[in-house]
Structures are given as structure tokens and as C-alpha cells.
Amino acid sequence: MVFRIASSPYTHNQRQTSRIMLLVLLAAVPGIAAQLWFFGWGTLVQILLASVSALLAEALVLKLRKQSVAATLKDNSALLTGLLLAVSIPPLAPWWMVVLGTVFAVIIAKQLYGGLGQNPFNPAMIGYVVLLISFPVQMTSWLPPHEIAVNIPGFIDTIQVIFSGHTASGGDMNTLRLGIDGISQATPLDTFKTSVRAGHSVEEIMQYPIYSGILAGAGWQWVNLAWLAGGVWLLWQKAIRWHIPLSFLVTLALCATLGWLFSPDTLAAPQIHLLSGATMLGAFFILTDPVTASTTNRGRLIFGALAGLLVWLIRSFGGYPDGVAFAVLLANITVPLIDYYTRPRVYGHRKG
């Protein structure tokens, strides 16, 4: 009898990286569809720009490194990076912004570290943060959902705004951002933070058109529920583990509830946190990145909980309305430490 000697791991996941990435791309369809419905064609244009930029940037670096271009591009990781960045930025952001952010994400945040599996930080979130810090006005210029918008740009106007900055009739972002109350609109999280700092009461803030949704912000609640649906499908397909999304959402909900109970005049209610911004996108599609997240089950719970706490702290007390990207990157920093203290004990090895 022949005994085969091999190093660990002794159990293997038969799914290839490309298939897992493809499952994540498919799971993003509900979220993309919801953003298209409420915010127009811009999301689709940004996805196309980001996808092409990601593939070209990755191909260029692979060519310079004398590595197989076709084999690496087939893993779909570049496409996923581009998609996650594209759905995170305003749909009418200038074309060069998504190109710049995607190229930075792929070349600097991913390939500079050695490529897929070597990068310590989520590339899409690195690209997003670079854009947010460099171009804060453009990165916070979201359109109002169509249900409260005065001007809804068509496909041609969308293309013209993205590539030239104005519509065929001469309209610009200022006119497109007007809501039914005649006031330029922002996201629910941005509106809440700005209004509280301006001295408005929570009761007044909740009367704004942006909060006319059944559960939370108009449009944004359905976008988050769509990303949640995609995330649940990923769990059902066993493409991701449940530990990170659950601990993230539970921690965020717990912190938001406690904060709201103790300070209802200054802090947002839990449903605003859970169903606004990039909450569900972050929980199921960004934090669960297998390369930059913790690799142990206990570590995943800690990692998700830490990210949830950071999101609430940044949203409630920080300078930015949504803290998902910063929370992800800060949590990424702690992964080596978390994995070190949560690694499974070797069989037969005693504690201490």
C-alpha cells in the first residue's frame, strides 16, 4: 500500500476563484437594478467605465510583470473590484473619477502588493477613499431618488453629464439634485448629519422628503434591501460565510439602538443606519472579501463586529456621513492580529 505524504490543508474547496467571483457578480444584480431604478442610468455607465478600466489596468501591469494576462483576467477579480467601486460612487460623477479610482485600486492597492491574494486592503475601498479625500464635493453629489426628484435625466443626458458636466439643455448637477421641495438633496445619512449640526431637531429632519420611505430614506431603503437579497443568495450558495455579515449588522444595530435611546435628539435611529448608505453592500459584498478579512470563524465574528462599531462611530461622530469604506480599511489593518489570537489550537497541543 502506498501512503501519500502531503502538506496541509487536507480538505479542499473545489470551487475555483473565478467561479466564486462570478457568483458575487451575479449576486450584485439586484442591488445594481435597484440603483438603476432609483438613480438612473449613471450607475450602469459607471460600471462599464470601471470594468474596462480595471481590465486594462490589470492587463498592463501583468504585461509589465511578464505574467499571463489571459489566465489572470479570467479570475474575474478585476471586474469585481471595478463593479464595487462603481456602485459606491455617485452615478453622475465625472468619467475620469471612476477611471482614476479604478486604476489606483487595481495597480496600487492590488498589483503593487503582488496581485490577488497578497493585498492587505480591499482595493475597491482604497480607490473609493482616495476619490473621497481628493474630490469630496463630487463624491457626495448623489442624485435624489426618482420619487422625490424634480429633474430625472434620461440616458442621453446622463452620458452628457458624465462626460461634459451638463445636459443638452444646459442643466448641471445643481439642477439635477433638486428635490420636490426645491432644495438640493443629499443622501439620508449626509442630510441627517448636516441638519443636526445646523441645529435642526430630529422631528424636523424626519419631515424632509428624503425620509419619506416606509422604513428609512426614500429609495435607499430599497437599494439596501436589494443588496441584502443578493447577500442572502451568496450565503445560500455558500460563496461567503455568515459570521462577518451577522456580527457586523448586529453590532451596528446594537450601537445605533443604544445611541438613539440615550441621545434621540442627535443620533439617528437604527433603521436609518441599517437601510441607508452602503450598509448591506458593505456587510455582504465588501467585508466578506476572503483576501482581506479574517480567516478564522472567531476572527470573522470579531472582524465584523469591529467594522460595525467603526461604521457607527464614524457616522455618528466623524466628519464623513457614511463610514463603511473607512471602517473596512481600519478593520483590514487588524486582521493579522485577529488571526494570530484566534487561530485554532493544533490537535494535541495544550493551552499555555
From Swiss-Prot:
Q: Which domain of life is it from?
A: Bacteria
Cofactor dependence is on: FMN
FMN phosphoryl threonine: residues carrying this PTM? T187
Q: Which residues cross the membrane?
A: 20-40, 42-62, 89-109, 123-143, 214-234, 242-262, 267-287, 301-321, 322-342
Q: How does it sit in the membrane?
A: Multi-pass membrane protein
Q: Which is one Gene Ontology cellular component term of this protein?
A: plasma membrane
Asked if the Swiss-Prot or TrEMBL record annotates the protein with the keyword Cell inner membrane, the reply is yes
Q: What is its main location?
A: membrane
Decide whether keyword Cell division is in the record.
no
Provide the alphabetized UniProt keywords.
Answer: Cell inner membrane, Cell membrane, Electron transport, Flavoprotein, FMN, Membrane, Phosphoprotein, Translocase, Transmembrane, Transmembrane helix, Transport
Entry's localization field: Cell inner membrane
Which protein family is named in the record? Belongs to the NqrB/RnfD family.
| PANTHER family according to UniProt | ELECTRON TRANSPORT COMPLEX PROTEIN RNFD (PTHR30578), ION-TRANSLOCATING OXIDOREDUCTASE COMPLEX SUBUNIT D (PTHR30578:SF0)
Query: What is known about its subunit structure?
Result: The complex is composed of six subunits: RsxA, RsxB, RsxC, RsxD, RsxE and RsxG.
Tell me, what does this protein do in biology? Answer: Part of a membrane-bound complex that couples electron transfer with translocation of ions across the membrane. Required to maintain the reduced state of SoxR.
Protein name per the record: Ion-translocating oxidoreductase complex subunit D
Q: Which organism is it from?
A: Escherichia coli O127:H6 (strain E2348/69 / EPEC)
Q: What is the lineage of its organism?
A: Bacteria, Pseudomonadati, Pseudomonadota, Gammaproteobacteria, Enterobacterales
